[in-house]
Regions:
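Vicinal oxygen chelate
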Residues: 1-20, 22-32, 50-51, 60-67, 72-151, ...
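Solenoidal tandem-repeat scaffolds enriched in leucines and small polar residues
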Residues: 152-157, 161-162, 168-173
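Conserved active-site tyrosine of GNAT-family acetyltransferases
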Residues: 37-42, 125, 159-167, 220
Length: 294
């Protein structure tokens, strides 16, 4: 100690720590009809079909900022919760949603306006909550997937916090009665307790990237939690357990990638959904997914 006084810091430096999880890249949901999926994800929501990968008729990757929906053909899968989206223009979104009724009649498709967001249900029952950009609440995102909220049984949140903190090595916090698990700079998994009976897990998955890819693998593998070995860069697990007693608290497939995975932080093409052939402005075709520096 040289007697030099410590500087007073006006910021909570721990807020900048990401921990071991650095990417929420996609949510994977099977869809039985690619045409209806295009009508919903591309025409109604205004997302962008990936122009380079999965361009055939049996799968679609739909870009939303730095994240994606992966939509392979198969029996419909329904996430037990809500996917949060930030989309740039509420009025234009409502216009697109209204126009999409003609293509999605006879399905579960619906949307409802609320203060601060629009609740949208896909043709097969998946729930989306669409927000306008709001730096104070959702970070500096203008187009993206700030959270995936999952419905869980009563009494499970303390154990789930222990799992993600001790086993996965990321930070958690309780807000408004829900558990927020940080999974990237401005992205969260949110777990909210409910008394409603939940359907059995149907195989849908979320994809995360880990810094300590090998260390977390070893901790999960010691408990027999690894469910699939995909490649040198990727593995999966399904069960979220309480580290204290091993009790299974929730099931959702986690596709885990390393930071050496060839697709890690792959730049994604995002279109400006306001640009059409009838309302065209040269140089404005692309959407900017983040706000400029303050």
């Amino acid at each position: 100690m040289d007697g030099t006084p410590k500087l007073a810091c006006p910021w909570d430096r721990t807020e900048e720590s990401l921990g071991n999880v650095v990417e929420l890249q996609h949510v994977n949901l099977q869809v039985p009809d690619q045409l209806k999926a295009t009508a919903f994800y591309i025409s109604a929501l205004g997302l962008t079909r990936d122009p380079y990968l999965m361009t055939g008729i049996d799968n679609m990757w739909a870009n939303v900022g730095i994240s994606q929906f992966h939509l392979p053909t198969g029996p419909a899968q329904v996430l037990r919760g809500t996917v949060g989206l930030v989309l740039p223009d509420r009025a234009q979104l409502l216009h697109r949603l209204d126009r999409a009724r003609r293509w999605l009649e006879g399905t579960q498709y619906s949307f409802t306006e609320a203060e601060g967001h629009i609740d949208v249900t896909c043709p097969w029952g998946n729930r989306m909550r669409c927000h306008a950009p709001d730096a104070d609440r959702l970070g500096r995102i203008t187009l993206g997937m700030p959270y995936v909220e999952l419905d869980v049984a009563r009494g499970t949140l303390p154990g789930m916090a222990r799992f993600y903190e001790q086993m996965i090595g990321t930070s958690t916090a309780m807000r408004d009665g829900a558990l927020y698990v940080r999974v990237a700079r401005e992205q969260f998994l949110i777990f909210r307790e409910t008394d409603k009976p939940q359907p059995a897990f149907d195989g849908h998955h979320i994809q995360l990237a880990f810094v300590d890819f090998g260390g977390i693998y070893n901790r999960l593998n010691e408990r027999g939690l690894i469910s699939r070995e995909d490649s040198a860069h990727q593995y999966r697990f399904i069960k979220v357990v309480d580290p204290n007693d091993g009790r299974v608290l929730f099931e959702v497939e986690h596709e885990i990638r390393s930071m050496k995975h060839p697709l890690f932080m792959r730049p994604l093409v995002n279109r400006n959904a306001a640009i059409t052939n009838n309302y065209y402005a040269a140089g404005n075709e692309a959407a900017v997914w983040a706000m400029p520096p303050a």
